[in-house]
């Protein structure tokens, strides 16, 4: 009998073991679709980004008009740009849902997979930030100025660090060129980290909604989950194309239709919607260094999650109190997102401060406490 190339060829064998003959739990729900959706997002973003980079000029005098030129004169340039800009939003929707799934079902107990995932989130955030600066509109320029300026809060080396990052004494041409270089490079770093993420995942196998060992009941990834993933792709690509074709500027800021002007500050500087929760936490602390530390902590706290798991059961499927707390956390994040988009005035200041406090309290104190309480309740 001739050897099966799919199982014997050094390269095809790797593809086979991770996408075709991979044993997967039979009961994983649609919440397990987001990993593959993120893969599709990454591929779409790299493809559209490559096409955009061919028409982009990373120079302060030409950046804005080169983007306008792409939209006006390049074949389907408007579509490529709209897919790229809104694709970023869908990337973040998918990653937030993916993290939420991991949190709800205790997937963070696979520590290496979880930690590489958090590193992926941080890299994605960095990529989105430097990418937002490239069109060189008003919000691009002032967003870059405000966020890079935060590094000046670091004691002793802060100011030097900021000027080193800027390549001068303000956000200018050197900043734009290096941000373009970084924006081109980082997606490939994300792709590399994704492979590490998957390598760690395939060491343990997937978790499942019950959080129990499922080795006795595994099914092949293909055709069952390949088909399910294709359904997921359709469910994501449909709203993405709808958004890109019907209201491409819905999630953008109108300020970005104005070319960058260092002499005029926009009335409300705010980032894209996917950073608003962190921005609200940053603004809720009146002290600059304190705000920067809170901003960093709001994302880095994810590294602590595996150590804060005190429950005997892995998932929240049969833990109603933890479920309630989880949805309170989700609501809290939505409130933070809303507050981040509002001006700094009463009542938004106090709402933001309370929501920020609640965010850290839930994660650091309430989840471990409720987990321990539920353990006690199991004994009765």
Curated annotation (Swiss-Prot):
**Species annotation:** Pterodroma hypoleuca (Bonin petrel)
The answer to whether UniProt assigns keyword Iron to this entry is: yes
Protein's UniProt name: Cytochrome b
Describe the subunit structure. Answer: The cytochrome bc1 complex contains 11 subunits: 3 respiratory subunits (MT-CYB, CYC1 and UQCRFS1), 2 core proteins (UQCRC1 and UQCRC2) and 6 low-molecular weight proteins (UQCRH/QCR6, UQCRB/QCR7, UQCRQ/QCR8, UQCR10/QCR9, UQCR11/QCR10 and a cleavage product of UQCRFS1). This cytochrome bc1 complex then forms a dimer.
Q: Name one Pfam family in it.
A: Cytochrome_B
Q: Which InterPro entries match?
A: Cyt_b/b6_C, Cyt_b/b6_C_sf, Cyt_b/b6_N, Cytb/b6-like_sf, Cytochrome_b, Cytochrome_b_C_euk/bac, Cytochrome_b_N_euk/bac, Di-haem_cyt_TM
Task: Set out the biological process GO terms recorded for this chain's protein.
Answer: mitochondrial electron transport, ubiquinol to cytochrome c
Instruction: Tell me the residue numbers annotated for binding heme b b562.
Output: 84, 183
Please tell me where a ubiquinone binds in this chain: 202
- Localization, UniProt: Mitochondrion inner membrane
Query: Which PROSITE patterns has this protein been placed in?
Result: CYTB_CTER, CYTB_NTER
Any one GO MF term held by the record is:
metal ion binding
One Gene Ontology cellular component term attached to this UniProt record is: respiratory chain complex III
Hey, which family's this protein in? Belongs to the cytochrome b family.
Instruction: Report the gene name.
Output: MT-CYB
- Per its database record, what is this protein's job? Component of the ubiquinol-cytochrome c reductase complex (complex III or cytochrome b-c1 complex) that is part of the mitochondrial respiratory chain. The b-c1 complex mediates electron transfer from ubiquinol to cytochrome c. Contributes to the generation of a proton gradient across the mitochondrial membrane that is then used for ATP synthesis.
Q: How is the cofactor bound?
A: Binds 2 heme b groups non-covalently.
């Amino acid at each position: 009998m001739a050897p099966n190339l799919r199982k014997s060829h050094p390269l095809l064998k790797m593809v086979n073991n991770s996408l075709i003959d991979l044993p997967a739990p039979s009961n994983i729900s649609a919440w397990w679709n987001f990993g593959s959706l993120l893969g599709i997002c990454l591929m779409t973003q790299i493809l559209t980004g490559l096409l955009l980079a061919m028409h982009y000029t990373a120079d302060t005098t030409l950046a804005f008009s080169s983007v306008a030129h792409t939209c006006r004169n390049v074949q389907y340039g408007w579509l490529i740009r709209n897919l790229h800009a809104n694709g970023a939003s869908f990337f973040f929707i998918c990653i937030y849902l993916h993290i939420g799934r991991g949190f709800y079902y205790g997937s963070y107990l696979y520590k290496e997979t979880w930690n590489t995932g958090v590193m992926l989130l941080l890299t994605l955030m960095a990529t989105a930030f430097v990418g937002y600066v490239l069109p060189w509109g008003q919000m691009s320029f002032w967003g870059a100025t405000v966020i890079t300026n935060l590094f000046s809060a670091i004691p002793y080396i802060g100011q030097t660090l900021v000027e080193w990052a800027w390549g001068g004494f303000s956000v200018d041409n050197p900043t734009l060129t290096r941000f373009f270089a970084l924006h081109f490079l980082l997606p490939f770093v994300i792709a590399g980290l994704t492979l590490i993420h998957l390598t760690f995942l395939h060491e343990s196998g997937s978790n499942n909604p019950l959080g129990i060992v499922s080795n006795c009941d595994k099914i092949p990834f293909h055709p069952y989950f390949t088909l399910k993933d294709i359904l997921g792709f359709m469910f994501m690509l449909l709203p993405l194309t709808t958004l890109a074709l019907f209201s491409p500027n819905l999630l953008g800021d109108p300020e970005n239709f104005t070319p960058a002007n260092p002499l005029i500050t926009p009335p409300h500087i705010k980032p894209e919607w996917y950073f608003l929760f962190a921005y609200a936490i940053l603004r809720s602390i009146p002290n600059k260094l304190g705000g920067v530390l809170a901003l960093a902590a709001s994302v880095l706290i994810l590294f602590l999650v595996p150590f804060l798991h005190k429950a005997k059961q892995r998932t929240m499927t049969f833990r109603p109190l933890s479920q309630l707390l989880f949805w309170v956390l989700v609501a809290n994040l939505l409130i933070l997102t809303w507050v981040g988009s509002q001006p700094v005035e009463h009542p938004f200041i106090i709402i933001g401060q309370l929501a920020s406090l609640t965010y850290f309290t839930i994660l650091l104190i309430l989840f471990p406490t409720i987990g321990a309480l539920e353990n006690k309740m199991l004994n009765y």
